[in-house]
Every structure is written in C-alpha cells, then in structure tokens.
Amino acid sequence: MFSLLLGVLYILTPTVWGDISQRATLANNLVSNGTGTPYSMNVTDCPGYTLGSLQESDTGLTAHLTLAGPACNAFGLDISDLTIEVTYQSQSTLHVKIYDTANQQFTIPESVIERPAAPTTSYAGNSDLIFNYDATPFAFWITRRSDPGAMPLFDTRTSSLPPTPIPPFNASDASTAFDGFPLVFEDQYLQVASALPYGTNIYGLGEVIASSGFRRDIGTNGGVGTIQTHWSLGVSDPIDQNLYGSHPIYLEHRYNTTTGKASASGVLLLSSAGSDIFLQTPPNSKVSLIEYRMIGGILDFYFFSGPSDAEVIAQYGSVIGYPMWQPAWGFGFHLCRWGYHNVSDDRENVAQMRAAGIPLEVQWNDIDLYHAYRDFTTDPVSFPGDEVREFIQELAANHQHYIPIVDAAIAVTRNSTDVYDPFTRGVEEDVWIKNPDGSLYIAEVWPGYTVFPDWFSENMLSVWTDSLKNWSDMGVEFSGIWLDMNEPSTFCSYSCGTGANFSSVGPLTDVSSVVIGYPECYNETLWGPSGNMTVNGTSTYSCAANSTTMTLVEKRGVGAGREEGADLNNPPYAIHNAAGSLNQHSLASNATYSGGYVDLDVHNMFGLMEEKATHLAIQSILPEKRPFLISRSTFPSAGKWTGHWLGDNFSKWQYLYLNIQGVLQFQIYQIPMVGADTCGFNGNADEELCNRWMQLSAFTPFYRNHNTNGALPQEPYRWDSVANASRIAIAARYAMLPYWYTLFANSSMAGIPPVRALFYEFPDEPELFTVDKQWLVGSDILVTPVLTPGASTVEGIFPGRGSVMWRDWYTHAVVNATGQSTTLDAPISHINVHIRDNSALLLHQVPGYTIYETREGPYSLLVSLNAAGTAFGTAYVDDGISFPPGPSRSLTFQAAEGTLVIDSNGEYEIVQMLETITVLGVQKPTQVAIQGSPIEGWTYKEATEELVVSNTSVGLNGQTTLVWR
C-alpha cells in the first residue's frame, strides 16, 4: 500500500491488515440479547456462570464455564463459553486462569512476558494454597492448607461479600456503586470481586502516589476507599490518579488480633487491559472488598502464599522474572537537568562537583542534547558529536559515566531534503504503529509530527539497535540509557498528523520562561530568588512554628467523562482515567500494531516492550557489560530490563515525603532500582529542602538530582550546607556499597526486596503497618529522615518494642527506645541512620570520589552484637560489571561467644584486604587474636562498648577467625 508523506511517496512494506482487533471475530461466538446497543450498563441481571466438564490432574484442574442464564450485556457482549485452568505452579504459587474458550480475547504474548514452565512436580496435594469452588453459580475461593478454617485469602462467593445494591460511595459518580458481584466476562468488560477482612492492610496496585500513604485506603477508619485505575499516563505526579505504569498486584499483610500474629499473601492479575480496581468497605459491612473492572483481556490470576512479605515479593518475581543485574557504578550519584544547554555546561558542572568534593558518578543530558528534539541526534552547535565524544571520554578517563535521554516518539521528516535515518529506515522496515487503515499513525511530541515504534514488528529490534549504535558511533558513547515519555505520551489526540502538511510544522518551543514557585515556608517575594536558608544572617523560614501540615496537590475527583458509543477508542465502561478519554495525551486506542494488536489491549505494555528492546540493544552495543537503564513507564516484568525513576515530581516538602512510598511500592513490583528526582523536578528548590532531600535519596537505590528547564539551579554545590550534607550522605552511601550490592545480588538471584517497610522485618507489630516516613535498607539499616521544614528534631519509631538494640551509624551509641515514637536530634545536614543488632556489614573503609576508586580501596567490617552476643551477615562480591555475571565470592560473618568467623566461598579473587574490624556491644577484652595469634593493634571505647581492630590486612578469599576474651 502507499502513503503520501511530506510530499514524498513512501512505499510501505505490504502488510495484511485484517481485523483491527483479536476480538473482531467474536461475534459468531457471543450471546446477544438481540438489541445490539445500547448495553444495559448494569450488572444486576448478569447471570454468572456454571462449571462443568471438570478434569483433574496431578498439577490442577480444567473445566468449562457456561453462561448461567440470559446474557446481560452490561458493557459489552457476554461470552457464553469459558475455560478455567487451575495450576498448582509451585509449593507457594497457585495459578487460576479464566479465558474465552474460543481464544479470541487478548492474552499477553509469551514474547512480551515469559511465564513459568508447566510444573513437572505435583503440588496439588501439598501446596500451601488450596483452590475451592462452587459449581452453580460458579465461584471460587483460596485458602491456606495450614489454616483452612480462616477467612480465605481470596473469595468470590456472593455470600461472602457485602449485600447489594450498594449506593455510590461518591455521590457524583454513579459508577462507584456496586450493583452486584456476579462474575462478568464480556468482550469489553470483565468483573470479579473478592471479600477481604475488614480493614486489612493492602499495599501495591500502582503506580500511584496515594494520599493514604504506602498502605492503601480500604474505606475504613475514616477513609473513602480507593479507585485505582490502570492506564499508563504521562502526567506530572498527581495524587490519587493513574500514573506512568501499571502494576495490578497487591500485597496483603493480614494481622490476627487474637493470636497477635500476622501473615502475608499476594495476588497478581496479569492483565494489560485498562481497568479500575476498587478497594472499599460499605457502611455497616463487616467485611471489606476488592473488585476488578477490566475493559478487555482475560482473568489471569496468580496467588502467592508468603507467609512473609519478602517471600510474597520473591514469589511474584519467580513468575514475572527477577530484577536485572545492576552495574556497580549505577549505585553512584547521578546528576542531570533539563537546561544544560551545551557541552560547556556539562564540563562546568563536572568541574564544580569535583571542586566541591561531592562525588559525581554519572553526568546526564536531557532533550537539550538533541538536534530539533529528534532522538539519536546531537545539536550541531551546542552538542557537536566530536565534542560530545571528547567530553564523554574525559569522564571515562576519570571512571565516570554518561547517560542521555531517549524519548519514545520518532520525528517524521518534513520534506524530501530532510534527512533523518531512524524514521526513513523505520518506514522501509515497516516498524511504525499504524492507523486501522494501514497508514502511519502520526501524533505530535517535542520534534513536531512523530511516529511511534511498533514493538511487535519483527524488524523493530534491529532498527532500534542500529539507531542506538549509530548514535554511539556519532559521539554519544553512552554507558546507559534514560527512557522517557513512553506511556507513550503525545501532545495531541488521535492521529493528528495524518494528512497534514509536515513542512509547516517544526519542533515545539520548549519552556524558556523563568519557573516560579518555591517550597512551602520560603517566601521569594520577601527574601528574593536565592532559596537560601538565611539572608543577611536572618532565617528565611516563614511557616508557623512546628508546622507539619501536608496539603494535597491536585487530588483528583473520580468520574472520567463518558462518551456515547461503544468502540475501541471509547469502551462502554469508562475507566477513571485521569485524562478522561483514553486517547488524551496518548495514542488512540485503535492505533494498530503488527499482528493486528490494538493499543486498547497493549497500551500498558508499551514501556515494557521499549525497555526490553533497549536492554537487548545495549547488550549488543556494549557486549559483556551490564546494561543500565532507567525508564518512566513500567509493567510487570519491567525490572528484568530496567530501573525506574518516580517521574516529574515537585520541589515541595510533601513530595520529599511521597518519595518514600514510591520507593517502597516498586520493591513490591520487582523494580528495586528506583528513586525520585532529588530536590524536585517542577518548581524551584530552596536550600533547606535540597539539603534534606540530598540526604534522604542517599539511602534509596537510584540517586539522581534532576530539575526542569527555567528553574533555579539545584546542583548540590550551589549551597554550602547542601554541599556539606551531600558529602556526608554520599560518604555513608559509598561506605555501604558492599551491603547495597549484596542486597541487589539477592534481588537478582532470588527476588528479595533490597528496601523494606518496617513491618516486613517486624510483622507482628501493628503500629508499623502504616509507617512510611521511615524505611529499612535490607534488614539492618533504619533510615529516619526529616520531612518538614524548620525542624531540628525528628520523630521515629524503633521496631522491636525494646527487644532490639539500634545503634547510631555515626557514633555507634545505642538508642534508648522501647518501640514508641522517639525524638531524635536532626540538625541541618544530618540524617538519622541506625544499625540493627545481630548484624554484620561489610563496608568500604575509605569512600572514594567514584565507585571505581571506592571499590579499589580496603574493606572494613562492622559487627553489631545483640544482647546474646551474636551477629550474622553476608556479602556477595564480583567484578561489578560483567554480563552475564562471572565468577563471584560469597562471604558469611558469624559472631557468637566472643568469636567472629568469616567464611569465604567462590571463584572470584578479592584483591582488597579487610583492614578494620569493629565489634559493637562487647565487654572490654583483655586479649584479641586473629587466626589464633594474639595481636596488639586494637582499641576499646567504653561508652559504646566498641572494639576496633585496625590494620588487620586480612584476606577475604579464605576463612578467618577473630577471638576476643
């Protein structure tokens, strides 16, 4: 076929464009009420299904589900014949899949997300979980084998759910009513609900910035409940709206008030369909509920037994894939802004960071780098290729790295003389998304008119890889890639460029005006634009004393506008998309991919598919090195390919706090390399906010300072106090790198979350279930940041209710805490960090300016004994860069009864010596020996019960014993 573009006749590769959706052939298999449209828009009369033709096997069961009565056609056409497959996937994982027997509904292809292989061992008789069902009407519930009499983990029986009808919990939005809880399976609408324990603890179901905090609002204790919409949307970090990614998994932490014990479980609905997920507790109800409302696809559930929170997360990882291996340099400090206008700006920034003694590992560039905002280009004046190459090689010579941005949209050439190979090569290879008629889908983004990659095209990976490689060959010798705008985001509705005169539209003009707006408690009209904490010796703080108010920013009202008609762009059920219509700020839902897939079905996976392609491309371009990738839009299994930053946040104190719940969320989603734009992206940061934020982010996995064009500079060297805070925090971070690296190795090998909510480690302490102003790095490092302006102290809770000793990271003093809220000193430039007892941490003794320099230096070991005098820890060591990971060495540290034993196993040879061993919680010894030989080089500090053994020069490739008596 032909498409007239830009005055040039492009011959498109012939493609068979049949039905624009897999559902188009459903009509012959659907039950119709004979009225066509409109649909009933109500599930009250939906009949549910009846189970029959049951076949059991060693690994589960298969059965047919038949519509139990006249079709209701609530928001689509009822599908009369379904199949249910139940598979005991492993000891801890149960898979329940309900799909149309004709296999016409969209199902996520294995090429996008590889599923676990069919089990070869029978778990049906000893699985942690049991599948129970009623045949008529069909319903199912999941129980624990160990406690079959307890309330089920998931229960779809209407008798277990609150009685209906339930009026709207938002009076202005009729769709927030619950008319009934039948199983509904239609071509454009699926619904299933489960009872939950009253007021139980639910986490996940993102991506979201929830006003309720890390724990989701389930409609009890004064809450209004939750509508979590899953439709990837490129918006600037609003609260209680759908965001960049879709992760329909939740973690339930269920506490038994009778026994005082808690257990965790998890539920994944593996679906890319747009959806609303409701969490609610109706008035006077004794149970809460979760309801899924989907606009396509199938019901593909995985249930995880836990019983610990970390085990649930790991079990989820075993299904969708464990996180990618991170290069060691990725844990360094990254610096970026939209507004580094040329290579000289980059060079000046790097020089200023070094002059201030603030470690800089990675320099980034935003879209300033591009020529006419086109991917895979550099501006010939501001960023000429040879100069960019020279700059990047200067970084590399100092063991530093460089990362550029890649937007999802690809510019369309404007006329016959316009040369842009990524676009024209893509046309030749037929790799761009199309309209239903086969013409190119053309939207508008930064470069002007643009096309979008069709990740289902068999040629897409080679075009993408070549574009990245050519860019690197031109001078942009990247170490990693930053993927942005990949929900995907557009600046117009539908295919607005189809048939347009491309030569009349150039790149969009970026924001060039000065950004206004400062953090709470800074009055720029009174104190000027510096953002300093003091001006002429006077404090600029302007809030009421001890104010801790957190105001909501743009909290949405529920109820997306419903457009009449039932087509792909406007499904009969209108999910609560923050932008309204599904095509707003993104592709139209009938945008068509290879194989006939439409955006309605695959929209939420666009970012994932780009991440996979980019990861594979980097592997090809930088062989034998671990790719480093940070992306905005994510979906289940994205962590195999990328890390994530929390999007376009604000330079506000509230967003400093919201940073924490985002990091905790993405540990659940198996995307542990995550962090926020430190000091905030939108608006101007001030000195105090940036001081506190640089400290906080030093204890999150991904550590990058980034802000918007036109805003005041916020690099950490801009204020003396921020520079000081940064040096202190980064020194602590780099000292802890062996610990961070071990946590991430465990994540890549077994799915264990590196960053943890407090209750993960202390599951039976209900006072911790809502704590999201503190967090744990691993099991042993407790972080308590300042989150409000004008503070010199901070309140924190120390888990363990007095049974655990927590020692200050800096002084090693024991905190006098009993599990209640404790007031800690927190002067400016200080963040409270505490070490758990019964721990042993391998550290870098001398943090260097770069990760390379730090890793080249000696190790130290910090042992924090508990009251019984024991401690335990592990470390994983390898070269930090090879892919696939090469030889490694596993270390264990175990202390008891005055003896520390270091065991070492593996093939990797650790060259650096262990030079210092510090043991906390010991009585003053009279003799210290290593390998049975008494030594003299030790000191003791009475106040902290601290034994320091210096200049040990112990190798870490064999067993070592330290004894104190």
For each feature predicted by the language model, list its residue ranges.
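Catalytic-domain carbohydrate-binding cleft regions of carbohydrate-active enzymes
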Residues: 19-56, 60, 154-829, 836
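Fungal secretory targeting signals
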Residues: 1-20
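A low-complexity, Ser/Thr/Gly/Pro-enriched, surface-exposed linker/loop concept
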Residues: 28-69, 78-126
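Beta-strand-rich binding/interaction modules
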Residues: 82, 792-811, 912-931
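Hydrophobic or amphipathic alpha-helical targeting/insertion segments
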Residues: 123-171
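Short, well-ordered beta-strand segments enriched in hydrophobic/aromatic residues
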Residues: 63-65, 86, 96-98, 128, ...
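Extracellular/luminal ectodomains and secreted, surface-exposed scaffolds of diverse proteins
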Residues: 931-957
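Accessory, solvent-exposed terminal regions and/or long lumenal/extracellular loops of proteins
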Residues: 33-44, 51, 60, 835-933, ...
